[in-house]
Regions:
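Hydrophobic faces of well-ordered beta-strands that scaffold small-molecule active sites
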Residues: 3-5, 44-46, 79-84, 109-113, ...
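Conserved, mostly hydrophobic/aromatic
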Residues: 3, 36, 40, 71, ...
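N-terminal beta1-alpha1-beta2 module of alpha/beta enzyme domains
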Residues: 1-74, 158, 174-179
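Short, acidic/polar
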Residues: 23-36, 94-97, 184-193, 296-310
Length: 351
């Protein structure tokens, strides 16, 4: 199991808690990622939104790609997975930027490809936001251009959305043939595009049974393309680790006390502009990315056993959220991660 975390670029993950003591500043982000390296985390995921989806559109947030480049220069081991939304980017310029950050990081830069869901944000920032399936058609062409520029000495492309004429990109990325392309999606068209064009599949939080079904489905879809298996299956989850179940449940009740909040500004766009497999309740939206559904809430032993259940279902990358970030990441690294290893070893010795 690889342990990843979402970089706190929005000032937290809780829509019902105003101040989580984790400011959306570069200094705090740098402190978090450098500490995470010391504690044994493998990956960080930097979301790309120009408006703050957690605390409200009027609140501060960090821009993803400039933050990724800066953090690449002050870290040594951790994978820096950064979201990219084709409706906001020129693919040739994106290919160049990604190759550059891959060199800054010495091969640690990866992409999370997102076809976008927030129409109001696109309106404010001049992004291209068309009907659902067309967004995925654009994504497919976008990925064609990235891969072509990363792998061919001279590249031309004549598509519906993008035209490239004898373009050269040098230097190529450190990673061959390309930086890993992660993506998540639940619609039929989304799963088709991801199976055909991406390297790894990431999911919002879900129960073990939900996640196992999704993994099996995507494995079959990938096999049907004739390509190598997906490099990873990842899942988002929010962690509440406490000494007792009672303490953990008290914290859960506190953060899911739904209030009127500007942090819910994107809720209707998220459920209406996406094609979701799971019905989302307002309580689920209290925490980002359906993070409560995996139920990593309780004692270290409960959380460790639950992680092993997801590992058995096929998850090999967790993308975790914590609040407050530094304190809870350290607790997880010291109390949960070693316990997962010892429980796994004990299970193997019994078998």
């Amino acid at each position: 199991m690889k342990y990843g975390f979402w970089l706190p670029i929005f000032g937290g993950w809780l829509r019902n808690v105003e101040d989580e003591q984790m400011p959306p500043t570069f200094d705090y982000a740098k402190q978090v990622i450098q500490s995470a390296e010391k504690w044994g985390f493998d990956t960080t995921l930097i979301a790309e939104l120009y408006l703050n989806d957690i605390k409200g559109p009027e609140q501060d947030s960090l821009e993803a790609w400039s933050t990724a480049a800066a953090l690449a220069a002050v870290t040594e081991k951790i994978e820096i997975m950064t979201a990219v939304r084709p409706g906001f980017h020129n693919p040739a310029v994106t290919a160049k930027m990604a190759a550059n950050i891959d060199h800054i990081s010495n091969g640690r830069f990866t992409l999370n490809v997102v076809s976008a869901w927030w129409e109001e944000e696109a309106r404010q920032y001049g992004g291209i936001f068309t009907e659902h399936d067309e967004r995925y058609e654009r994504t497919l062409e976008f990925l064609d251009v990235l891969k072509g520029l990363w792998t061919q000495e001279t590249f031309s492309y004549d598509g519906k959305f993008y035209q490239i004429r004898e373009a050269k990109l040098a230097p190529k990325p450190v990673q061959k043939p390309n930086p890993v392309l992660y993506a998540g999606g639940e619609s039929e068209r989304g799963k088709q595009v991801i199976s055909a064009a991406c390297d790894a599949y990431v999911m919002h939080g879900g129960t073990v049974e939900e996640i196992e079904r999704k993994i099996n489905d995507m494995k079959q879809r990938r096999q049907a393309t004739g390509q190598a298996p997906f490099a990873a299956f990842g899942m988002a989850a929010y962690v509440i680790c406490r000494a007792t179940d009672e303490e953990a449940q008290e914290e859960l009740a506190r953060i899911t006390d739904v209030k009127e909040s500007s942090g819910y500004a994107g809720y209707q766009d998220f459920i209406n502009k996406s094609q979701l497999e799971t019905q989302i309740q307002l309580r689920d939206y209290s925490v980002s990315n359906r993070g409560l559904r995996p139920n990593l809430v309780g004692t270290p032993e409960h959380i460790a056993k639950t992680i092993l259940a997801y590992e058995k279902a096929g998850i090999d990358l967790l993308l975790l959220q914590f609040s407050p970030q530094l304190e809870e990441m350290e607790r997880f690294a010291k109390e949960v991660m070693p316990l997962v290893e010892s429980l796994r070893e004990a299970s193997h010795s019994l078998s």
